[in-house]
Each structure stands twice: as structure tokens, then as C-alpha cells.
């Protein structure tokens, strides 16, 4: 899918742009790519210009929503197929996303992009072939690229999430020549596609599945056995579990994960908000 290169607005950015216009300024400087860079817009009374393209001023925008230019107007970065999937701004710049209102990335203490850096560091990706089971917005993959991974095999099941990646400037572009083909992104269900991955062909893995109630197959013994099969001995796996409430879910998911991974052939230790597993 082609990447979006136009401006992205959140409510605060719109307010700042309109305030500059109303104050009679001829220019406004700020970020129109969710804090990734700074730029300057030329202001006129009825329209404004950015990177040589003329746009109408955005209307009043909703909070917790990111807007992009669809060629006719500024619209929400969201889609509804089987679920409502939405790109959501954070105070850190790099956005998170939600599926039916459920936040898919941690944002309470730090940027989800920074959170990904800490987790990727656990598997020491430099020079390695990395399996990224649930690509999401691609922050794990981006951090693996930055850390010098030789190759990242990334899977994402949801087409709407892949579409969000084309809007999000923080998401890595698999087709960017600067990445030298190291990121291989596939639109596929990893619970099925992993059967096609060769034995002991992966040096390290990152597993950040949706919650158990959404994707129980990604917590199954069958899937963990496949992870053990494709990882070489000594290979590291970080598995995000979070801290689901046992009283509301009726399950101790982290304990279940640990038991199944050990049965599959991993040695475990707690790390961050998940487990770090070593292939025995």
C-alpha cells in the first residue's frame, strides 16, 4: 500500500494553526507528522500551504483522534470492517491504536515507540534474523532495524492495521530503500503461517499478541511448540503478557503462558511486562 505523505492533525495542532492565522501571522511552525519532525506552513485567510500543497483549514476536531487529508477533506484515521480500528494520539508523539476501544499498546508511562526499544533490547537483535509475530504499527520492527537486525520477518493479520501503518509516520516502511530489504512484512495470520517457517531458522523472536480473549490461538501450546521449533537453540523470545486481572478474566494468563512455554522447551524469566524465554 502507498504511504501517506500529507499532514496529520490532532486537536491541539489545529488549535495552534488557527490561533496563528487569527493573530495575523503569515507562517506557523510546528509538527504535522505527530512530533516526528518540525515544519513551516504558509498561512492565508481562507487556506494554508504545506510542502507546496494548498489545504483548507481543518474544522473543529474531536479529541483523541488523528485526522488526515483524503483528497477532499480532513477525516479520522479509522476504519470499521469487523471491528472499529483507530489510530490514537499520545502525549509522546508516536501514536497507539485501538480495536473496538481497547488500547493495543502501553502509553501510560512512556511512548509506545520507547517501550518497544526496551523490549527489543532484551532479544539483542543486532545481526540476527528476528521473527515479529504480530506486527501491529511496526514499532518492534522499527526498533529492530535501528538496532541492526539482519532481517525481520513480520506478520500482521488485520488489513486495517496495515492501512493505519501507511498513515503513521512512526511506522517503518518495508519498501523504503534505506532499509535494504531487511524488513519483510506479510499480511498473514501468523498462527497459520508459522508452519511454513523452517526449523531453527530464526535467531530471536518478539511475540506481542492481542489479549487472550481476542486471539487465544496465539497463546496455545500448538503455537508455542512452533515458536520452539523455528527458534535456534539459545535463541531469545520476548512474550508480552501484561497483567490481566484474574478476578475479571477468571484466568492467570501469565502463569498459563509460562507453563506452556516451559513445556515447549523454553527457560523463562520475568522481564518488563512479559517474559523473556531462552530456547533450550
Task: Go through the PLM ranges and name each one.
Residues 110-128:
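Conserved alpha-helix/loop element of class I SAM-dependent methyltransferases that forms part
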Residues 1-90:
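N-terminal auxiliary segments of SAM/dcSAM-dependent transferases
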Residues 137-149:
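Conserved SAM-binding loop of SAM-dependent methyltransferases across substrates and taxa
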Residues 243-280:
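Class I S-adenosyl-L-methionine
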Residues 155-199:
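S-adenosyl-L-methionine
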Residues 219-233:
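A short glycine-rich, Lys/Arg-flanked "PGG" loop and its adjoining helix->strand segment in the class I
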Residues 234-242:
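Conserved beta-strand signature within the Rossmann-like core of class I S-adenosyl-L-methionine
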Residues 126-137, 153:
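Conserved class I S-adenosyl-L-methionine
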